[in-house]
Amino acid sequence: MGILKGKKILITGILNEKSIAFGIAKSMYKQEAELIFVCQNKKIINKIKYLIKSINYNTIFFCDVSHDENIKELFFNIKKVWNNFDGLVHSIAYCPKKQMHEDFVESSSRKSFNICHEISSYSFLSMARECKNMLNKFSSLVTLSYLGSQKIVSNYNMMGLAKSSLEANVRYMANSLGKNNIRVNAISSGPIKTTSSYQIKNFNKIQKIHKLFSLTKNHVSSEEIGNVAAFLCSDLSIGITGSIINVDHGFNLNGINSII
């Protein structure tokens, strides 16, 4: 029996077959979760339906998380399908491309700062607030972060700030929602080739360096992220909350490596 048998999980952020959220969906489906998907663009709903046709799911919704009223409407509609559920996977982020290709200080603006934090961090808090009364005991909220939240990663720039905000969100949300027996965690993933990651200047170099200095000398896969997300949404992780879990083949541990 799968570790998510009987669990209802909401997954956001699938864009295409390269999306980390798609890897998470496949892992959770293997573990027998019941799934609903949320996408951010109405134009790609049919494309996503085709992509996930091999995955048994309830339905797919659209939500523009930059508007609180849309988030309220999303959970109003979800309640028509699920009165209660057990988990939310937040795989949503956005940063203007310019911020990942030019000098951080010179290219940063109030507008880019606000939209990057609003979509990448605040949306997690807003979704949690709207759905908390629908969540079963020991439900799990999971989001995705990256090393650039804590360390300098070339060209990650404004997204690094937003991921720092997101990780702080995880801690404070875990504290606030703990009294409701709701757990909140983040997975800090190694670099994976996705449509979004290719917006980062010199991403291929970043990925090569990651493989060279990871402890196992391997790239991270979306399946590996999916397996950890499935664990975090299962009862096997019932004692884990407020944590940032690194899934990067140990890259985050490295200082001056003997390979030099």
UniProtKB/Swiss-Prot annotation:
Protein name in UniProt: Enoyl-[acyl-carrier-protein] reductase [NADH] FabI
Gene Ontology molecular function, alphabetical: enoyl-[acyl-carrier-protein] reductase (NADH) activity; identical protein binding
Purpose: Catalyzes the reduction of a carbon-carbon double bond in an enoyl moiety that is covalently linked to an acyl carrier protein (ACP). Involved in the elongation cycle of fatty acid which are used in the lipid metabolism and in the biotin biosynthesis.
Residues with site note (Involved in acyl-ACP binding): K201, N204, K205
GO biological process, one term: biotin biosynthetic process
Family: Belongs to the short-chain dehydrogenases/reductases (SDR) family. FabI subfamily.
Enzyme Commission numbers on file: 1.3.1.9
Catalytic activity of the protein: a 2,3-saturated acyl-[ACP] + NAD(+) = a (2E)-enoyl-[ACP] + NADH + H(+)
Source organism of this protein record: Buchnera aphidicola subsp. Schizaphis graminum (strain Sg)
Keywords: Biotin biosynthesis, Fatty acid biosynthesis, Fatty acid metabolism, Lipid biosynthesis, Lipid metabolism, NAD, Oxidoreductase
Residues holding NAD(+): G13, S19, I20, Q40, D64, V65, I92, K163, I192, K193, T194, T195, S196
